[in-house]
């Protein structure tokens, strides 16, 4: 994995540092596997469901608005290059 070609900028987070690190690493791996936004979101969501128990939601794209309710300590919104990633647990 070549993380040097990815610029990550966390915009907002209510999540422990170790989970933020997992989120960014998982996202880089997903981008290494595919460039299809829906598939990237699915990879991240499934990994977090497995690692931190369901139910996680993930949105990946270049332009979107959002307003969500999330469980405490289970939210991150960050940019990776020209994409944005919203990952949160609810339900």
UniProtKB/Swiss-Prot annotation:
InterPro entries: DLC_sf, Dynein_light_1/2_CS, Dynein_light_chain_typ-1/2. Gene3D superfamilies: Protein Inhibitor Of Neuronal Nitric Oxide Synthase. One of its GO terms (biological process) is microtubule-based process. The keyword Cytoplasm applies. Pfam families: Dynein_light. GO terms for cellular component: cytoplasm; cytoplasmic dynein complex; microtubule. SUPFAM superfamilies: DLC. GO terms for molecular function: dynein intermediate chain binding. It is found in: Cytoplasm, Cytoskeleton. Signal peptide: none annotated. Coiled coil: none annotated. Its main location: cytoplasm. Keywords: Cytoplasm, Cytoskeleton, Dynein, Microtubule, Motor protein. The keyword Cytoplasm applies. PANTHER family: DYNEIN LIGHT CHAIN. Acts as a non-catalytic accessory component of a dynein complex. Belongs to the dynein light chain family. This is Dynein light chain, cytoplasmic. It comes from Dictyostelium discoideum (Social amoeba).
């Amino acid at each position: 994995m070549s993380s040097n070609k990815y610029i990550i900028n966390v915009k907002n987070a209510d999540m422990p540092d170790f989970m933020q690190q997992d989120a960014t690493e998982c996202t880089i791996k997903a981008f290494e596997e595919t460039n299809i936004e829906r598939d990237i979101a699915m990879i991240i969501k499934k990994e977090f469901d497995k690692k931190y128990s369901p139910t996680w939601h993930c949105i990946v794209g270049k332009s979107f608005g959002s307003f969500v309710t999330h469980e405490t300590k289970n939210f991150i919104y960050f940019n990776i290059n020209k994409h944005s990633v919203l990952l949160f647990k609810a339900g």
